[in-house]
C-alpha cells in the first residue's frame, strides 16, 4: 500500500457525509499520498462542492485536486480518471442495489470491481477503523505462482492497514469438503485437508505475526465463511483478491468478491494481480 502515490476518491454529491473521503484522508496521511476527488456527473456543476472538499483536505495537510467528468457510465468515468490521473487506489462508498435490480442489471459497484485497473476500497459504513480488526481472505488451496503472489499482496495490504490503525490482523481460508473419490488422499479426510491448509498458512502467520486465535480455517464455501467470520470478529476491513481471466470482454472478477460485498458489514478492499491490472489499463488506452 505504501507504493500508492495518488488515490482517486469518488464523491457522491447527493450524500451529506462523504465517508469515502474520510477513509481516503486517513490512508493519505499514513502513506503520504495525494488525493484526486472525482464527481461522475454531467447534468449539474459541482465545482463549488469539489472546491470546498479540496480546501478542507488541503487544510489537513493533504495534497488534493479534483475534477468532474462523465463517459457513458460511472464505471467508465472512474476507470478513465484512474488512468488519466495516475491513481493507484480507488475509494468509493458502496451503493447497495435491491435484489430485483441485481437480477435484471449488473450493479455498478460490481462492474467497478470487475473492470477497474486499480485496487478498489468499497466503504460500507462510517465507523472508525482505529484499533479494529482486519480480515485477509486467501485461498490456501491454490498453489500456482499467480495465486501465491496475490495472497502475499492481500496479507501485506491487510498488515499495512493494521499498522495504520493499530489493529489486529486475522487470516481466513475456506477449504472444500472431503471427497472419498479424490485421487489425492489428502482430500479424502476432513482432518487431513484442514492440516494441509494449516501447514500452508504458516508462511503468512510467521511472516506477518498472525496469532493462532486469529487464524480461521474451516470447511465451506468462501462466500459464506468470509462474511460469517468478518461479522463475528467485527472486522473494520476485509481484504480479498481475485485472479482475473483475460478475454475479449476484459478481465472478469471471481464472483466471491461480488457476493460478499453485500453480505459484509465491513469495508472491502479488492485486489487484483498486476498482470490483470495492466490488461485492464491497456484496454482503456485503446
Per-segment meaning from a language model:
Residues 1-49, 133-184, 207-210, 268, ...:
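Small/aliphatic-rich secondary-structure junction motif
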Residues 1-18, 88-89, 94, 104, ...:
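Intrinsically disordered or low-complexity boundary/linker segments at protein termini
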Residues 1-2, 45, 55, 59-100, ...:
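Structural beta-alpha unit
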Residues 36-38, 65-69, 121, 170-172, ...:
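General small-molecule cofactor/ligand-binding pocket signal
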Amino acid at each position: 500500500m505504501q507504493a500508492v502515490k495518488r488515490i482517486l476518491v469518488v464523491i457522491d454529491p447527493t450524500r451529506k457525509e462523504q465517508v469515502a473521503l474520510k477513509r481516503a484522508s486517513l490512508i493519505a496521511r499514513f502513506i503520504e499520498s495525494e488525493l484526486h476527488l472525482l464527481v461522475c456527473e454531467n447534468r449539474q456543476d459541482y465545482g463549488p462542492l469539489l472546491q470546498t472538499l479540496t480546501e478542507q483536505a488541503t487544510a489537513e495537510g493533504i495534497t488534493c485536486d479534483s475534477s468532474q467528468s462523465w463517459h457513458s457510465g460511472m464505471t467508465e468515468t472512474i476507470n478513465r480518471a484512474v488512468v488519466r490521473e495516475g491513481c493507484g487506489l480507488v475509494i468509493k462508498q458502496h451503493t447497495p442495489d435491491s435484489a430485483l435490480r441485481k437480477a435484471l442489471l449488473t450493479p455498478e459497484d460490481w462492474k467497478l470491481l470487475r473492470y477497474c485497473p486499480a485496487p478498489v476500497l468499497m466503504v460500507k459504513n462510517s465507523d472508525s477503523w482505529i484499533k479494529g480488526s482486519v480480515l485477509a481472505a486467501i485461498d490456501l488451496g491454490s498453489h500456482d505462482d499467480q495465486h501465491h503472489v496475490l495472497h502475499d499482496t492481500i496479507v501485506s495490504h491487510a498488515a499495512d492497514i493494521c499498522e495504520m490503525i493499530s489493529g489486529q490482523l486475522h487470516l481466513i481460508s475456506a477449504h472444500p469438503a472431503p471427497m472419498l473419490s479424490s485421487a489425492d488422499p489428502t482430500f479424502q479426510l476432513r482432518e487431513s485437508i484442514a492440516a494441509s491448509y494449516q501447514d500452508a498458512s504458516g508462511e503468512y502467520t510467521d511472516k506477518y505475526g498472525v496469532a493462532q486465535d486469529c487464524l480461521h480455517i474451516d470447511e465451506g464455501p468462501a462466500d459464506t465463511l468470509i462474511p460469517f467470520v468478518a461479522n463475528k470478529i467485527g472486522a473494520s476491513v476485509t481484504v480479498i483478491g481475485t485472479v482475473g481471466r483475460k478475454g475479449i470482454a476484459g478481465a472478469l472478477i471471481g464472483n466471491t468478491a461480488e457476493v460478499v460485498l453485500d453480505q459484509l458489514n465491513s469495508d472491502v478492499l479488492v485486489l487484483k494481480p498486476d498482470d490483470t491490472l495492466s490488461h485492464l489499463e491497456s484496454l482503456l488506452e485503446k
